[in-house]
Amino acid sequence: MEALVYVFLLTGTLMVIFFAIFFREPPRIAK
């Protein structure tokens, strides 16, 4: 059960960091 908690926290942290960097910088994909 603890493994699922660690995976959930790790995924959540990565998603938060990804969205923070993506929304902070202007998206270069959509011209």
UniProtKB/Swiss-Prot annotation:
Hydrolase keyword on record? no
TM ranges:
3-23
Keyword set, alphabetical order: Chloroplast, Membrane, Photosynthesis, Photosystem II, Plastid, Thylakoid, Transmembrane, Transmembrane helix
* Subcellular location, record wording: Plastid, Chloroplast thylakoid membrane
The record's Gene Ontology biological-process terms are: photosynthesis
- List, alphabetically, the InterPro entries matched: PSII_PsbT (IPR001743), PSII_PsbT_sf (IPR037268)
Listed Pfam families:
PsbT (PF01405)
Does the keyword field hold Zinc? no
Predominant location: plastid
Coiled-coil segments, which residues?
none
Report the GO terms under cellular component.
chloroplast thylakoid membrane; photosystem II reaction center
Report how it sits in the membrane: Single-pass membrane protein
Q: Which family does it belong to?
A: Belongs to the PsbT family.
**What does the UniProt record say this protein does?**
Found at the monomer-monomer interface of the photosystem II (PS II) dimer, plays a role in assembly and dimerization of PSII. PSII is a light-driven water plastoquinone oxidoreductase, using light energy to abstract electrons from H(2)O, generating a proton gradient subsequently used for ATP formation.
Subunit relationships: PSII is composed of 1 copy each of membrane proteins PsbA, PsbB, PsbC, PsbD, PsbE, PsbF, PsbH, PsbI, PsbJ, PsbK, PsbL, PsbM, PsbT, PsbX, PsbY, PsbZ, Psb30/Ycf12, at least 3 peripheral proteins of the oxygen-evolving complex and a large number of cofactors. It forms dimeric complexes.
Name used for this protein in its record:
Photosystem II reaction center protein T
